[in-house]
Amino acid sequence: MIHGIGVDLIEIDRIKVLYSKQPKLVERILTKNEQHKFNNFTHEQRKIEFLAGRFATKEAFSKALGTGLGKHVAFNDIDCYNDELGKPKIDYEGFIVHVSISHTEHYAMSQVVLEKSAF
C-alpha cells in the first residue's frame, strides 16, 4: 500500500551558490557514505549535481513520509546509495522506498514513492 509520494525540484545554481558560501553544507546534507562518493568525483560540476540530486531526494523523501525535514527526520537520517545497477536506493524501516533522480543543465529533481512494508 502506498504511504506517500514526494517530489522536489531544485535549481543546481542555488546549490552551487550555497556550497561556495558554506562548504560544511556537504556534511549537513550528506551521510558519511554519500560524502565519500561526493569526494571521489573529480569534476566540481559533477559534485554540485550530485549534491543537488541528493538534496532533492531527501526533500522528496520527507514529503512522501509526510513529516518534512526537521523534527522527525533530518538530512543525515536519509542515506541514498546506488545498487549494483546504479539505481538510487534508500533503506528505511517499515517501508519499501522507490527513488528516481534526474538532472538537466539547470535543475535536479527527485521523486520518491513510499510503500508500506508487509514485514
Swiss-Prot record:
Listed cofactors: Mg(2+)
Coiled coil stretches, renumbered: none
Top-level taxonomic group: Bacteria
Annotated Gene3D superfamilies: 4'-phosphopantetheinyl transferase domain
EC number: 2.7.8.7
Binding positions for Mg(2+) per the UniProt entry: 8, 59
Listed GO MF terms: holo-[acyl-carrier-protein] synthase activity; magnesium ion binding
Location within or outside the cell: Cytoplasm
Record GO biological process: fatty acid biosynthetic process
InterPro entries per UniProt: 4-PPantetheinyl_Trfase_dom, 4-PPantetheinyl_Trfase_dom_sf, ACPS, Ppantetheine-prot_Trfase_dom
Keywords from the UniProt entry: Cytoplasm, Fatty acid biosynthesis, Fatty acid metabolism, Lipid biosynthesis, Lipid metabolism, Magnesium, Metal-binding, Transferase
GO cellular component terms, A-Z: cytoplasm
Family as reported in the entry's similarity comment: Belongs to the P-Pant transferase superfamily. AcpS family.
Function in brief: Transfers the 4'-phosphopantetheine moiety from coenzyme A to a Ser of acyl-carrier-protein.
Protein name (database record): Holo-[acyl-carrier-protein] synthase
Origin species: Staphylococcus aureus (strain JH9)
Native organism taxonomy: Bacteria, Bacillati, Bacillota, Bacilli, Bacillales
